[in-house]
Each structure stands twice: as structure tokens, then as C-alpha cells.
């Protein structure tokens, strides 16, 4: 997975605040490293025990 960045524009009303707005316009960064590690772990488990995983999933009422 790739890291995603979302820019959130800062609002304002005065033109002389333009430089401050540009500097204070925030970016939200989502760290997906933990999610990638978890998905890698799940992939590893499925490679070794896919049949058992499916059986237990169906027994628990999964669709």
C-alpha cells in the first residue's frame, strides 16, 4: 500500500494573511505501516493455514 496524503485548505478572509495561510495550511498524513504489517501477517497465516481459516470462518457464521 502507498502512503496517502490529503491536503486541507485553510480558510481566511484578509489578503495580508495569505502568507500565514499558506504556511498554516495543514496536511493530514496517514501512517499505513502498521496496517501493512498486519496484512502481511494475515497473508502469511493464510498461506500456511488457508483451509483451516476458511473452516473456522464458516463455523463462526461468516458468509
Curated annotation (Swiss-Prot):
<dbReference type="GO" id="GO:0031386">
    <property type="term" value="F:protein tag activity"/>
</dbReference>
<dbReference type="GO" id="GO:0070490">
    <property type="term" value="P:protein pupylation"/>
</dbReference>
<dbReference type="GO" id="GO:0019941">
    <property type="term" value="P:modification-dependent protein catabolic process"/>
</dbReference>
<dbReference type="Pfam" id="PF05639">
    <property type="entry name" value="Pup"/>
</dbReference>
<comment type="function">
    <text>Protein modifier that is covalently attached to lysine residues of substrate proteins, thereby targeting them for proteasomal degradation. The tagging system is termed pupylation.</text>
</comment>
<dbReference type="InterPro" id="IPR008515">
    <property type="entry name" value="Ubiquitin-like_Pup"/>
</dbReference>
<protein>
    <recommendedName>
        <fullName>Prokaryotic ubiquitin-like protein Pup</fullName>
    </recommendedName>
</protein>
<comment type="subunit">
    <text>Strongly interacts with the proteasome-associated ATPase ARC through a hydrophobic interface; the interacting region of Pup lies in its C-terminal half. There is one Pup binding site per ARC hexamer ring.</text>
</comment>
<feature type="region of interest" description="ARC ATPase binding">
    <location>
        <begin position="19"/>
        <end position="57"/>
    </location>
</feature>
<dbReference type="GO" id="GO:0070628">
    <property type="term" value="F:proteasome binding"/>
</dbReference>
<dbReference type="GO" id="GO:0010498">
    <property type="term" value="P:proteasomal protein catabolic process"/>
</dbReference>
<comment type="similarity">
    <text>Belongs to the prokaryotic ubiquitin-like protein family.</text>
</comment>
<keyword id="KW-1017">Isopeptide bond</keyword>
<keyword id="KW-0833">Ubl conjugation pathway</keyword>
<feature type="cross-link" description="Isoglutamyl lysine isopeptide (Glu-Lys) (interchain with K-? in acceptor proteins)">
    <location>
        <position position="63"/>
    </location>
</feature>
<feature type="region of interest" description="Disordered">
    <location>
        <begin position="1"/>
        <end position="28"/>
    </location>
</feature>
<comment type="pathway">
    <text>Protein degradation; proteasomal Pup-dependent pathway.</text>
</comment>
